[in-house]
């Protein structure tokens, strides 16, 4: 039976009833009434504290500090913000030494990137390693982005071009941390089961979803695909794939300090899924811009929850449209049947034709 926390007015009334029962001849407007209200206020404070404490016991309702502590108890560490690293292409007029700590700036965002080691480049173009001085996903600049030297170097052109920049991630949101905790509870570690590979992949900063394929290329092989939904381009880069692969192959558990990872004698294939756009034709009532946008969001969320190579059931597509708030009637004209994604593809929302 659910317990309803009594309100202050309820506690005052209960106190008045108790005093009236025990002192039936007590007159109104006396000091007992004041004492009753003071006691009721103290009791209300205790009830509110107990109500708050009860929410902290359950991870799904706990506040940040308590959720993090509960996750640590289960061996899960909140993923901290990470720094983007990569390569920039510079052009030198002659043999030039680029010192470690040389700073390049993206004038559009104000982000700065610093060289990680001293590099000697010959006349022409060369790629040098840099890292962003700011943590977070914003450091993952697109290839071709122009950077400027903050201090001139003799023989080096003042501009550089991003060749690749990845690995930057924001601190893990509480909702994603909670999702990993629930997954850990529902699928305990099993020494190399398919859900272990999913758990390991999603422990890497920036990785939000992962899929595991047993016997990917036959016996003794495992395939792992993943996505990075917090970024503008959610598909992993080769550098992301290398990081996830290295983590799955072996890493030190931050909580226990023990080494863990995939079993020996397993051939691991880590790859980036590909996009497969799914188009729709929908007759909608009421056919308003607001409802269209709501249906678009509902379909995008449905497709995002589908896995790699998933089968998209037409009945679920219809239900997704029907369950959108504000919808009165609809007909899904296209697709006309279930949609089978290709084996290494994930679904994204394509074009919607409103009829």
UniProtKB/Swiss-Prot annotation:
Cystine residue pairs: none
Alphabetical list of InterPro entries matching this protein: Baseplate_J-like, Phage_Baseplate_Assmbl_Protein
Family membership noted in the UniProt record: Belongs to the Mu gp47/PBSX XkdT family.
Protein name in UniProt: Mu-like prophage FluMu protein gp47
Species the sequence originates in: Haemophilus influenzae (strain ATCC 51907 / DSM 11121 / KW20 / Rd)
